Amino acid sequence: MRKHGEKTYPHECCGFLLGTREGETNVLSEVHAAENERQESRETRYLITPEQYKRADAYARSRGLGVIGYYHSHPDHPAAPSGYDLDHSCWPGESYIIVAVEQGKSAALNSFTKPDYTQFEQEEILVED
């Protein structure tokens, strides 16, 4: 995620979090990069197409995993959800990782979830070895 954000800077990167769910905790096994398909405002927005989701989901299932969330970068902005992120992001239970990329270098990385549709809460996500 960090390298992907640095590579696409000053545009936002995006991708899928693949893993499993143990109780209320998402366990991250793999990261699956996606192409930001947004045509304009790529510095502050990203777009994952349904076709990209289908491919990532099929890949995850072939490995006994599922799509447990998404990630994207915030070029020259904090690793915290924006109002736009709140309105256009994940479903309850999914993880939403944001990596800050400052002047082309990866900085903070935080994971969030939305227990309901009204706000984000920072979460810990387990990373499988």
Language model features with spans:
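Conserved beta-strand-loop surface patch within small alpha/beta domains used
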Residues: 1-67, 76-129
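Residue-level "edge-of-site" marker
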Residues: 73
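Conserved, mostly hydrophobic/aromatic
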Residues: 70
